[in-house]
Amino acid sequence: MNTKNFTPQESRTNAQQVRQQNQQSAQGTSSGFATEFASETNAQQVRQQNQQSAQANRMSGATAGGFNTEFASETNVQQVRQQNQQSEAKKRNNQQ
């Protein structure tokens, strides 16, 4: 087993280096995540996509948003009316 005693200058941890790294880390902590997030988000591209989406919604006649448009596009109104009429007819027949 190696039991060599280290002098302060030979210590395994370089205190000055640790202080410097901590300082650099602290400086980056306040804005590091925000900077990374901003660098991965192309604001111009997002604006362009939002504009295209808004134009598409205006062209399709959407009033309140995408969900209403999607719901309406997947609902066959004529089929629903027909089913409602059949249901009402069955109710009338059952009441007689």
Curated annotation (Swiss-Prot):
Composition skew (Low complexity), residue ranges: 16-27, 42-57, 76-86
Site (Cleavage) residue list: E36, F37, E70, F71
Pfam family, one: SASP_gamma
Region (Disordered), start-end ranges: 1-96
InterPro entries membership: Spore_gamma
Organism domain of life: Bacteria
Keyword terms: Repeat, Sporulation
GO biological process: sporulation resulting in formation of a cellular spore
Sequence ranges of Polar residues compositional bias: 1-15, 28-41
Ranges: Sequence repeats: 28-52, 61-87
Coiled-coil annotated residue ranges, if any: none
Function text: SASP are proteins degraded in the first minutes of spore germination and provide amino acids for both new protein synthesis and metabolism. These proteins may be involved in dormant spore's high resistance to UV light.
Record NCBIfam families: SASP_gamma
Entry's family note: Belongs to the gamma-type SASP family.
Name the record gives this protein: Small, acid-soluble spore protein gamma-type
Native source species: Laceyella sacchari (Thermoactinomyces thalpophilus)
